[in-house]
């Protein structure tokens, strides 16, 4: 037993001194200047056990106090959270080192964050899960959630019911993962802890008391109980180990060297020993508190903070606007002026632009209106020409093929007269004779022919013939002498038409001999 204890003490003394950084510090101490690489000086990060000790100003005024929690409520929350971590570690069968690491991380975190803004139970779960991975005894996050669920049922004295895998479970799991990340961020990822358990065994070997099992076990118990206090963020691990041995020896009435005091050999002072012992003894004198009552106090502070923020923004807790007490309140609604009326007599540029457009449109409408059957202006002339052209085109499209062949000359002549009237002067065209039939029926007929179910091929030839006749009439109007020389132009055109009819007739007889016999 003594050999094993000596080996453990030697291993503990040979361990490196690198450990977790102080919460919120994350940098090098004030004495370090940095790291010199070449000609440049870079800032360095020094990770030692001194970084995990908090200064007195942070210990006196914590973030929970700034949120409105009193000191007793904060102390009770710290104790209850550490008790939950210890009980969950026992049910998860974690080693004692892992449970101690989780409690130290819990204490460090809540010296940088408030109990009002962060759930104590969620942070406890996150610390258990993180400590199990740090001490190389990982546990699944589902097991951690089930264990804490079971502890809550035992605390409320309810019948044990398994946790359902519903959306609430998924949300709780995500909250624990976020809490774990938050703990790592606040501690600067410096989460290693140097525990005094091995130091106790080594010091008892030096005092030649390692064979007293009762003294060793009592000192170990005081060490585990001190994890529920904040002594691990106030004092060095060596001082805590000396205080646990001192308190156990006084409790068991075992004399230890006092001239000089034995703890001076290990670098501890009498003031530190007495303060640590007092913290541990206060833990036993504390009354048992109800977690539900503590959670209610935290919720009250949350609501008070939310109301204060809402009043600072000028809103009620429901989000409604606060009414001004100085102005008289009348139940009748106030008439709010439109933005156009509120701007005054000066019109906006957009309204001026719209007014100009309306005036221009009215002028165009007056210019287009016919007076005594004659349209006004050049624009009206061009529109009347386009209408006459459309009216003259529509009958040709709806006409039969035979009629189209006979009327080709007349259409070309009409277009010729139109082109001549355009080129000679800008005088308004003559009014159409009143005896002429209404052309709306012809337009309807052309529309019906267009909407026919089975389109026919002659429609294409109609559009081509009309376009060709228009182009030919324009050529004749531009070059009248060219067509006067060719007196045989229309005669040749009639011959080509007769030949084309003869060709079609022969092809028809060749394809259908019976029909040719019937004609004969």
Swiss-Prot record:
The modification Phosphoserine is found at residues 330, 338, 348, 351, 369. The keyword Transcription applies. Residues 316-520 are annotated as: Disordered. Widely expressed. Signal peptide: none annotated. Residues 408-436 have a biased composition (Low complexity). It is found in: Nucleus speckle; Nucleus, Nucleoplasm. Pfam families: Cyclin_C, Cyclin_N. Residues 198-282 are annotated as: Cyclin-like 2. CDD domains: CYCLIN_CCNL2_rpt1, CYCLIN_CCNL2_rpt2. Keywords: Acetylation, Cyclin, Nucleus, Phosphoprotein, Repeat, Transcription, Transcription regulation. GO terms for cellular component: cyclin-dependent protein kinase holoenzyme complex; intracellular membrane-bounded organelle; nuclear speck; nucleoplasm; nucleus. Contains a RS region (arginine-serine dipeptide repeat) within the C-terminal domain which is the hallmark of the SR family of splicing factors. This region probably plays a role in protein-protein interactions. This is Cyclin-L2. The lineage of its organism: Eukaryota, Metazoa, Chordata, Craniata, Vertebrata.
